[in-house]
């Protein structure tokens, strides 16, 4: 009781803050479509150093306000995954302390980098802090899974191999990878990309390589070339159908792939955000400046993955 009272007192005078980091699928294999409509996936996932920012202030009612350059793209706050995640956790934790969330929306939406899922995961982490819950609390994990397929991996926000429908996470120690991320400011609905893949209910994709049994992963301290070799052997199975829906994705990949110092260019998730891993941070920054100059209306970020 004393601990709960202490947490309530602290939260009442001090807002809690967290970052919702962008998720990047370095590889993404679609193994098949389950009879329940979900797709079985295997993906090497990393997290970038760009993020939305979320704040929680104690209050008697659950609410959300959103600001930032992407706020007009967010839609109705009542449908936001932040609210959905909080409500799902409230169904599992008696007398859950919630309050007012404030979202600073920096990441593009419907972009293949888990923006909404990362926001929901950040909300769950904030609520865990406010209610003295461990991040591995089964109720928190279950709420994350029920919120969305990408929310569990975003809850951890650590590089990993993600399998199943996103519920199984195998740790993978990645080095810091210099990266440029580009979104051409077109939204791509995940359901449309999967539909374009054309898998029937219960259909398996015979012959798809299992990334878990891929060639041995390099040590974290291994040279960049070793990591590029393994990652380049992978693929994003959603890239081809996404390019059919939004051909500009192909243009982005071409620009990134021919940039000086680019070692690997690929689409993340269901698009339209693409990324390129570079030889060093200077090359990444130069490429980002070049893309921004040629396409000032695109979202461009130079940073690191890890």
Swiss-Prot record:
GO annotation (BP), single: isopentenyl diphosphate biosynthetic process, methylerythritol 4-phosphate pathway
EC numbers on record: 2.7.1.148
Active site: 23, 150
Keyword Transcription regulation found: no
Keywords: ATP-binding, Isoprene biosynthesis, Kinase, Nucleotide-binding, Transferase
Binding site for ATP: 108-118
One Pfam family recorded for the sequence: GHMP_kinases_N
NCBIfam families named among the record's database cross-references: ispE (TIGR00154), PRK14608.1 (NF011202)
Annotated protein name in UniProt: 4-diphosphocytidyl-2-C-methyl-D-erythritol kinase
